[in-house]
Amino acid sequence: MHKLVLIRHGESTWNLENRFTGWTDVDLTPTGIEQAKNAGRLLKAEGYEFDLAYTSVLKRATRTLWHCLDEMDRTWLPVEHSWRLNERHYGALQGLNKADMAKQYGDAQVLVWRRSYDTPPPALETTDPRSERGDLRYAGLQAGEVPLTECLKDTVARVLPYWNESIAPAIRSGKRVLIAAHGNSIRALVKYLDNISDQDIVGLNIPNGIPLVYELDADLKPLRHYYLGDAEAAAKAAAAVASQGKA
């Protein structure tokens, strides 16, 4: 049996301000830092060890991973960064307040933008200063690979090749893997692992900073999954994420 641990980054400054974040590179709040440290303490207390970690190229995830590993005294672990683990791109919504958008467009429309599988938000213009095209961290990508908006289906399409080509082979070889990523890149992985339908994925919310453990068989099919720590607290945190897009 293999174990895989997924952690959504701790609370970010734009989580606190209830803004759509996407690929915008915002930092952790003090609460987010403490969430990341607590995840590390929890993993250490439960006896978890890792051989390899993966994260995105956005600082809220990379710093979550660092704080987590620091608490475990494992900052020396090899870490692989990939843009494919970035948060879903929220297009022209990036930087805008979710509740304000719900007041303007209605809760139902914002829910579609936030949680539907195949409906992206309005795209950024290529000339919009919020666009990441031209950002040095994406210099090795083709222009079309740096999105102007994404739906979850698009996020799945970039996450799964990375899973199949890098992460899954590492797990099969016996590596104990930790992934620190984002709400929607984790939703993309969970959708794939648990074979969640396009309709049911709308109801899945990932809380900040709580380790999600998957026990996988030899074919990397899930045997079970669970959040470490207080299950009721994890459920409340997920419910709080769900309510962010309401007026």
Swiss-Prot record:
CDD domains from the UniProt entry: HP_PGM_like
Record EC number: 5.4.2.11
Molecular function terms from GO: phosphoglycerate mutase activity
Pfam families in the cross-refs: His_Phos_1
Catalytic residues of the enzyme: H9, E87
Coiled coil: none
Pathway entry: Carbohydrate degradation; glycolysis; pyruvate from D-glyceraldehyde 3-phosphate: step 3/5
Residues reported to bind substrate: 8-15, 21-22, 60, 87-90, 98, 114-115, 183-184
Entry's Gene Ontology BP terms: gluconeogenesis; glycolytic process
UniProtKB keywords: Gluconeogenesis, Glycolysis, Isomerase
Site label Transition state stabilizer, positions: H182
Enzyme class, first EC level, given as a word: isomerase
Protein's UniProt keywords contain Isomerase: yes
Reactions mediated catalytically: (2R)-2-phosphoglycerate = (2R)-3-phosphoglycerate
UniProt subunit comment: Homodimer.
Described purpose of this protein according to its UniProt entry: Catalyzes the interconversion of 2-phosphoglycerate and 3-phosphoglycerate.
Family statement drawn from the similarity comment of this UniProt entry: Belongs to the phosphoglycerate mutase family. BPG-dependent PGAM subfamily.
UniProt protein name: 2,3-bisphosphoglycerate-dependent phosphoglycerate mutase
Species this protein is from: Acidovorax ebreus (strain TPSY) (Diaphorobacter sp. (strain TPSY))
Lineage, opening ranks: Bacteria, Pseudomonadati, Pseudomonadota, Betaproteobacteria, Burkholderiales
